[in-house]
Each structure stands twice: as C-alpha cells, then as structure tokens.
Amino acid sequence: MARAVGIDLGTTNSVVAVLEGGDPVVVANSEGSRTTPSVVAFARNGEVLVGQPAKNQAVTNVDRTIRSVKRHMGSDWTVKIDDKDYTPQEISARVLMKLKRDAESYLGEDITDAVITVPAYFNDAQRQATKEAGQIAGLNVLRIVNEPTAAALAYGLDKGEKEQTILVFDLGGGTFDVSLLEIGEGVVEVRATSGDNHLGGDDWDDRIVEWLVDKFKGTSGIDLTKDKMAMQRLREAAEKAKIELSSSQSTSINLPYITVDADKNPLFLDEQLTRAEFQRITQDLLDRTRKPFQQVIKDAGIAVGDIDHVVLVGGSTRMPAVTELVKEMTGGQEPNKGVNPDEVVAVGAALQAGVLKGEVKDVLLLDVTPLSLGIETKGGVMTKLIERNTTIPTKRSETFTTADDNQPSVQIQVFQGEREIAAHNKLLGSFELTGIPPAPRGVPQIEVTFDIDANGIVHVTAKDKGTGKENTIKIQEGSGLSKEEIDRMIKDAEAHADEDRQRREEADVRNQAESLVYQTEKFVKEQREAEGGSKVPEDTLTKVDSAIADAKTALAGTDIGAIKSAMEKLGEESQALGQAIYEATQAEQAAGGAAGGDSAGASGANDDVVDAEVVEDDQERK
C-alpha cells in the first residue's frame, strides 16, 4: 500500500511529515532543513525555484518572486509572469510538489496520497482551493484537516485515557486560529473554533518595515517604498529582527547601500530596535487575538479555569508578548513547551493520514464547521440549516415552499456567515430548481439538504417532493473572502445584532401579513363564487375586503407598526367571517365537518413546511 504524508501548507513556511513504524517523522528537505519557505520564484532563465533557493534570490528578482500566497487562496487573485496568469492554487502547487519530491527522496518510493492542513477559519472557497492545489501537485488529497485539530492530535495521542480540555492558540505567518478541543480515549473532538484569516507574523514584519521606512525618511528625506529592491531587503531584515527580539532585548538593523541620494552617494540604514518599541508598534495586532479567544470560550460554554493544557502553534507564538498574552488570558496558565510550534501541525496531519490508511488504530477525529450555512428566504432572511461549530461530517434538511402562485422554479442561494440578513453574509454559490408543476403558493414542498463532508466542503441539494426532481451544487470556484469580509464576518454579527434582529422581525411580520392577505382574499373569493351564493351577508364580506385593502396599503409602506395593526384588524374580521359561516351552516343543519374545520380559510399549508419562502430573485446580485 502506498504511503501517505501529512503536509502543513503554511503562509511563510511549509512542513511535510510521514509515519515510520507508526511514529511521525518530519522530513528534511533537499537543503537539509525541516521547514521549507512557501516561496516560489521564476528565474529569468525559465527555471522555477521553490523554498530557500527562491527566498535567497528575492532581492534581485522582486517582481518574479511570490510569497505568502496562502492569503489569496479562494480568491480571484492572480500574478502575471511572462504573459501567463498564475492562480494561488498553481503557486501553492509548486510548494506542494517540492514537499512531495523531498518526501519521495526520503522514503525511496512514490507518494500519491496526502492529508493537507488549513486554518480552522478557512471558508469553503479557501478549502476547495487548497484541495485543488494538491490535485495540481499530483496528490490525492485524502482529507483537509484544520491546523489546530492536527496540532491537538499530535499533542494529545500519548496523554493517556483521561479526558482533557486543550486550548490550541495558532498564530502562523499569515493566519490566526484558536480552538478548544476535548481529548480522551482516542477521541479528539473540537468543541469550538474562531480566528482571523488575515493576522499573522507577516503583519508584525510589516510594522517593522513601516518603522524603518519612517526612520530612514526622517534622517535622509528619501521614501524607500518607491524602491522595490530596497523594500525586499527591509522585509528580510524585519523578519530577522523579529526573530532576534524573541530572545534579545534589542537588535541592530544594518543595511549598507540601501539606496543613493540625489548626488548618487550611497546611503546606509542603521537602526536599533528594542523589544519594548517593537511591542509598542505591534500592540494593536496582539489585541486582535483577544476577541477570537473570548468567542471560543463563550461558544464552548466553559470557564477559562476548565482548560487543562494550552498548546502554542506557529512560529509567531515564539514572540514573548504573545506568550505573555496567552498566559494572561488563560488565568496565568503556562503554555505547554513540549511541542515544536513549527512542526506539530504536520505531525498531526501525518497521524491523520495514518488513521485514514489504517496504520493508526482507535483514533477518532471530530472536527467542526467554523461558520454557519444557510439559504436566503423571503424578506432577504438568512435561514440557517447548519450552525457554526457543528461537528462534521454532517447532513441537514429542511422543507421550504414557493412565494408565488404557479412559480415554475426556485433560486437557491447558499450563504456562509453569522448575520441574520443573507446579503450581509458570504454568498458561496447559487443554483436553480426548475420544472415545478403549476400550483398555488405554499403548496409545493422543496426539500433543501446541506451536506458537509469531512473536508468541510459543502454540497447542497434541492428536491421537489412532488415530482422527485432535484438539482445539486458542490460549492466551488468561490471568489474567496476579502480581508474586510473575513475580519467583519462574526464581529459584524455582534455589532449589528440589534439591527439584524429588527430586520428579521420586520421580514417575519411582512411575510405573515402577506400570507394572511393571500389566504383571506382567496377565501372571500371562494365564498362569492360558491354555488348558491355566499352563506354570509355581503356586508360581512365587505368588511373583510376593507381590512384586506388596509393591510395591502400598510404592506406597501415601511411602517411595521401599521402592518401589525392592519394584520390584527384583518385577523379579527377573518375570525368574524369564519364565525358567520359556522352559524349559517348550523342553521342549515349541514354536515359541519369540512366547512367548519377551515373557519378562517387560512391554514391549508402542511405543518411540516418551514414558515419561510424561497425568493424568486431575478435581479443580478452585486
């Protein structure tokens, strides 16, 4: 049986590990290092360089060197090299191909299967893009696993049978995740996860670069941001300074011949950066990790004191300020020092590959979906079918109905996010279920099923229960979340909670009013057209007509109070109409079962049908 590897495809560095005799081993690359820079360069002679060789020549080949491409996964970002546009998947595939080659060289055999990790907070498009990168690299991706989950798997397998609660704080080069997991008796279960897909060591580097640019401009009057080669040298110096400040109180940044002045005289950059100054200019970045941490504790429903172990993952957690913050937030608990933050994710991925290949027994990995999933229903409401932090794989179904009479098709629009109003969430994709037989609104039953596989990738099916006709979409080719979208997604849900609740209530009231008007209008029409004429006086029907007209007028406006008032009045008149019919029927001594049972004429819908309607949306979504 072919071997499977575990790969941590990182923003700044990547790692590959494999099981040897049941134990995970991190594979050194062809340069002898256990981590490979996630950098790809296209040399002028046509050669493609990957890893450390690509990083080494970046200063002299700035425009043709690509780094931190993970931040663009799942988006429509491309980079043009020699008139060819490269997608993030293609660039990532180059890194994966190198890791694959290095592992094959180590094992002496071909490798086709891999488990690849992603940040827990990656959305569907980003996960799909990662899987595609693996396929481009010639790998059969057995599973996409969340990085904190892989880390917990690597950390917790040898910790005995006792159930433990573990907090994984994962701050890498470009992404941040925090997850709470329970481990015991071979089961690794994720309780909650949160994060920020655009927060990582790169941001700390950028702050040092900005600081150096400002310092140099202050002394020489020259703006280095206009010089690409100088900026590349600053970036490399900033990364080196950041690493040095993890063990030293200050560091010297010395860059000779950084640029020239107006008279072509060479200029030197020589600055001293202290740890205190570094922490001051990056304090706001550090503070951005607090909210996801608090969110995870809240979602898991536990107290900070219930955490048994804290595991730090990602090279950026080596910064003393990060370690101190984690210690502060966990009530003084010392983070575990027994894992290598650069390698633990790849080790966990290799273990999961072993589980899937049958090499590792009695281990069950239960992961969760990081964001809620649902569809847009009438009134622009987000009707959630799967809530965030639901264990995956999972499958959920709900039945919806049509919004208009004789509606021939429904547009199913799939969203991911936490806001009550669908448009405020991330549109993952849409598809149409056609061929619905002509029927009054509320009669067709459309069953919508969400199926999330173990990779966190979404499949959606819509089925007309009446005809058995169905349509399925596998959500892919997403545009990815922009930085603004990913940062705002959950915090917007909290900031706008009241506004969203109000919008949802308004949509619900409007839906109820429209439904009551429709059903009552239909019933009045049936009474007037009944054989032998209506059983109730015309003035009773006229009162109902008047109430219907008032309700329609209210619905044409935006005053929810007026709609509620008109709905109450219509309800009263509808009840009076039902009572009059009942009394007339009793007087005629007719069999009162069928006619009397539908006194208000407004309850023909199936009780199993969810009280929400799929919107027939002809307008192009912006």
UniProtKB/Swiss-Prot annotation:
The modification Phosphothreonine is found at T175. Induction: By stress conditions e.g. heat shock. Residues 608-622 have a biased composition (Acidic residues). PROSITE patterns: HSP70_1, HSP70_2, HSP70_3. Residues 588-622 are annotated as: Disordered. Acts as a chaperone. Belongs to the heat shock protein 70 family. This is Chaperone protein DnaK. It comes from Mycolicibacterium vanbaalenii (strain DSM 7251 / JCM 13017 / BCRC 16820 / KCTC 9966 / NRRL B-24157 / PYR-1). The lineage of its organism: Bacteria, Bacillati, Actinomycetota, Actinomycetes, Mycobacteriales. The gene is dnaK.
